[in-house]
Every structure is written in C-alpha cells, then in structure tokens.
Amino acid sequence: MLERLQQLLPPPADPVEPGRPDGWPAVERRLGTPLPTDFKAFTERYGSGTVDDFLYLFNPFVAGEDGNLLVETDRVLAGYRQTRARFPDRLPLPAFPEPGGVLPLGRTDNGDELYWVTEGDPDDWPVALLASRAALQELHRMPVTGFLAALAANHLASRILPHDLLGRPSHQFTPSAEP
C-alpha cells in the first residue's frame, strides 16, 4: 500500500524527523504495543508533515512535544477518557490500552482526531475518525496508508473531512516538524 501512496502522494526528498528502523522497539515498549508496519514504513519514508496542510499524523521521533506520538497519546487519551465518561453514547469505543481501544494517530486543522482501533493484529487496525464539532465518527476498515491513499485518490467517503479536501485534483505532503 505504501507504494501506491507514494505514487499518489509523493514523499519529500528530504523528510523531517523520519526516524530509523532501530528506533521503533523503544517506542513500542513505551506504548506497550507493536505498531502497524505500514505506519512505521510511512514515518521512515515521509517523516513529519501535513497532507494538504490539513491532516497531520503523529510521529514518535518528533523532537518536541507537539505532534510527538508518545506525548500526544497521553494528552489525547486523557481528554478522550474524560469526554467518554461524560458522554459514553458519543464515544462507544474504549481508550487504549483496553482491548479494542482507540490509540491516537493524528489530527486535522479542524481539530478532528484520527485513531487506530486496536483490535487484533496491528497490521489490521482500522482507522477511526472523530469529528471535533459534532457527534460524528467514522470507521475506515483499512490501514493508515490505505486511508491516505484513498484520500489522495479521491476515493475516501467521509462526512467529517471537508469536501474541498476530498475532491482536490491533486494532494501534497509538506514536510514540517510542527503540526
């Protein structure tokens, strides 16, 4: 799937904070779970940055706190748990590390949040998208690179993402250390 994504959304020639294969064991120990292979390959090839200056995936190799997968996991899940305790009908999925719990993956400029749903093999984790301004959530049963490739090919159906993002004639990845 990464090959298809690279055709649709060319990676940067000089990625920002791409990490290395030998850095993942420490990240996975800290999180307490293996991460999807495609996400690791994406991070190593693309590094940090945004898709269309709108969508940012967290990266455990970011030097600062903002956008760092490890820091954002703690922050985002704390807020998720509080909101879920008050509005369990809006957030039916548990928070990681509960089985099938959500694990933060990224966010949009609109404040929408992307999560993995940690059910089964990490390479099979679907992507969940939660709207920031409405009680909407979507489950996309595909890996993160499949989600990005579907977005870049204009084949992603979403009631949460803006229509002008979904229908662009082309998409761009911009390397950046800041989300």
PLM ranges: what are they?
Residues G101, D123-P126:
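A short pocket-lining beta-strand/turn micro-motif at the edge of beta-sheets
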Residues P104, R133-L136:
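Short, glycine/charged-rich beta-strand-loop motifs at protein surfaces that mediate ligand recognition
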Residues E113-E119:
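Short, surface-exposed beta-strand/loop micro-motifs that present aromatic residues
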Residues Q137-S158:
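Compact, glycine/acidic-enriched structural inserts
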Residues G106-R107, T118, A131:
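Pocket-edge structural micro-motifs
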Residues M1-N110, I160-H163, G167, F173-P179:
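A surface-exposed partner-binding patch
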Residues P126-S132:
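Catalytic Cys-His active-site segments of thiol-dependent hydrolases/isopeptidases
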Residues N110, D121-P122:
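Short strand-connecting beta-turns/loops that link adjacent beta-strands
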